[in-house]
């Protein structure tokens, strides 16, 4: 008997595989080919070590995240690139959950996988800066706003 489409379980498995491949590929490739961090990356780490409430050019969230992550897992290029890809994977996950609210499993999977061809989610995603941090923040914010309105629960607004 022929079935059309993929099941929700298969889609979740393929989405998990997609996240794993993306995370490994976009952590290894820049880690093997780039031997120094860009100036924004070094600036965020240096600022984050001070744990100040504000900085000259930017708000403190990103420097705090970078410094906290690198102090926890070690200061090296690999961990910085890994952090930038975790940021992108958080966005992919939020987009996946939101897409599942509207589309069948295969369509939601395609919606997320096709984002790999958008430069901000692939090769530009290796630079973690304030602009790229907004990719995950907007995705998560949009998801929670939708859930708050759809499910009428105050918890999603918090």
Question: What residue spans do the PLM features occupy?
Answer:
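Transmembrane alpha-helices of multi-pass, membrane-embedded glycan-processing enzymes
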Residues: 66-70, 83-94, 134-137
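Short helix- or helix-capping micro-motifs
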Residues: 19-21, 111-117, 123
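Extracytoplasmic catalytic/substrate-binding loops of multi-pass membrane glycan-assembly enzymes
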Residues: 28-44, 53-68, 74-78
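Membrane-interface transmembrane helices that cradle and orient dolichyl/undecaprenyl
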Residues: 100-101, 105-106, 141-156
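Start-transfer (signal-anchor) and selected internal transmembrane alpha helices
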Residues: 1-25
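Short acidic/glycine- and proline-prone juxtamembrane loop motifs at membrane-interface regions
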Residues: 126-133
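Membrane-interface alpha helices of multi-pass inner-membrane proteins
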Residues: 47-50, 111, 144, 153-158
């Amino acid at each position: 008997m022929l079935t059309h489409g993929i099941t929700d379980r298969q889609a979740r498995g393929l989405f998990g595989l997609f996240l794993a491949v993306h995370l490994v590929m976009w952590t290894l490739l820049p880690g093997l080919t780039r031997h120094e961090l860009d100036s924004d990356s070094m600036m965020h780490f240096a600022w984050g070590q001070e744990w100040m409430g504000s900085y000259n050019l930017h708000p403190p969230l990103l420097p705090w995240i970078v410094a906290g992550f690198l102090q926890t897992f070690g200061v090296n290029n690999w961990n910085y690139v890994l952090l930038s890809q975790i940021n992108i994977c958080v966005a992919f996950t939020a987009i996946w959950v939101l897409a599942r609210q509207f589309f069948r499993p295969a369509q939601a999977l395609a919606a997320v996988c096709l984002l790999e061809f958008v430069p901000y989610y692939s090769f530009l995603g290796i630079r973690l800066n304030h602009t790229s941090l907004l990719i995950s923040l907007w995705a998560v914010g949009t998801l929670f706003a939708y859930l708050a309105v759809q499910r009428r629960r105050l918890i999603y607004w918090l």
